[in-house]
């Protein structure tokens, strides 16, 4: 169905208040967007971190009387009469279908392809992971996921056990299994990620070789030949004591979700227990890998 979009510009510390006002005026959803397209990384738990110059965007049903909405919002103390705004009619689209149409098979390394479950595989002889991301992060389109997939493709995983710490959609654990790993373990804090990983494992015929745990339930004695963690720099630093004990001696560690500018700080948290490789970069992101001493 078609929608009406109302966009306001404000400062970060006023954005949530204006978002509440849009909901009260009849918006069915509100989103926040940086006016200058700068990313915000690693909000603290429970924190909604916003930009200094923020667009507040409300989505309204096409039948909404926007003159009435504007009149109502003029009483808001941060706005007032004649406040600056932009109203736009959004065309009627099947947004889910549009997203699906833009998600294409992607190749990583020499052998590995990640293919949307609704598309044909381009090379039936390759190692193909059929993926439906669902609500969990991890499609291969993000540079950090790509860096991890390329790294896994370059390892000899035959007969190995792999831990995917922060498994999201399960893409890394499933790719490892399809690349020859005997067993994989996926860990995440989000139940939706566990479900998405389980569904994707079934789709790829590897369910019997994949264990999945919420982080609070993971066994204390887990270990693996290969450990990959594609999360964020802050958690990688904070969880270094936990992650560092997971690889066996001589095992491989791969870390991503890290901006290139954060690489040194993350590497420092692991350098005592690992012989680290040169950092690999893709766009503004990087991957840190090493061997357990």
Swiss-Prot record:
InterPro entries from the UniProt entry: Ribosomal_L11_MeTrfase_PrmA (IPR050078), Ribosomal_PrmA_MeTrfase (IPR004498), SAM-dependent_MTases_sf (IPR029063)
Catalysed reactions, as listed in the record: L-lysyl-[protein] + 3 S-adenosyl-L-methionine = N(6),N(6),N(6)-trimethyl-L-lysyl-[protein] + 3 S-adenosyl-L-homocysteine + 3 H(+)
Root EC class: transferase
Keywords, alphabetical: Cytoplasm, Methyltransferase, S-adenosyl-L-methionine, Transferase
Gene Ontology biological process: methylation
GO molecular function: protein-lysine N-methyltransferase activity
Enzyme Commission number(s) from the entry: 2.1.1.-
Annotated positions binding S-adenosyl-L-methionine: 145, 166, 188, 230
Pfam name, any one: PrmA
GO cellular component, one term: cytosol
Primary localization: cytoplasm
Localization, UniProt: Cytoplasm
Protein family: Belongs to the methyltransferase superfamily. PrmA family.
HAMAP family on file: Methyltr_PrmA
Known function: Methylates ribosomal protein L11.
Protein's UniProt name: Ribosomal protein L11 methyltransferase
Gene encoding the protein: prmA
């Amino acid at each position: 169905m078609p929608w009406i979009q109302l966009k306001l510009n404000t400062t970060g510390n006023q954005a949530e208040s204006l978002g509440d006002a849009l909901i009260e005026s009849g918006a069915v959803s509100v989103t926040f967007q940086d006016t200058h397209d700068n990313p915000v990384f690693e909000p603290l738990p429970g924190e909604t971190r916003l930009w200094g110059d923020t667009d507040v965007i409300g989505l309204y049903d096409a039948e909404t009387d926007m003159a009435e909405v504007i009149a109502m919002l003029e009483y808001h103390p941060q706005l007032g009469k004649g406040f600056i705004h932009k109203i736009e009619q959004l065309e009627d689209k099947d947004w889910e279908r549009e997203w699906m149409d833009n998600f294409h098979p992607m190749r990583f390394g020499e052998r590995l392809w990640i293919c949307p479950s609704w598309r044909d595989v381009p090379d039936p002889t390759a190692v193909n992971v059929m993926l439906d991301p669902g609500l969990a992060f991890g499609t291969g389109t993000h540079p950090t996921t790509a860096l991890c997939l390329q790294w896994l493709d370059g390892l000899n995983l035959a007969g190995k056990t792999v831990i995917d710490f922060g498994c999201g959609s399960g893409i890394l654990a499933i790719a490892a299994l399809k690349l020859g790993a005997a067993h994989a373990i996926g860990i995440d804090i989000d139940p939706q990620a566990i479900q998405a990983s389980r569904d994707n494992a079934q789709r790829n015929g590897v369910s019997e070789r994949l264990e999945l745990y919420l982080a609070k339930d993971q066994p204390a004695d887990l270990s693996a030949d290969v450990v990959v963690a594609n999360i964020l720099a802050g958690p990688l630093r904070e969880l270094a004591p936990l992650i560092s004990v997971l690889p066996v001696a001589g095992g491989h560690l791969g870390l991503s979700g890290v901006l290139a500018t954060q690489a040194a700080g993350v590497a420092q948290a692991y350098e005592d227990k690992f012989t680290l490789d040169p950092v690999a970069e893709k766009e503004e992101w990087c991957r840190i890998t090493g061997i357990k001493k």
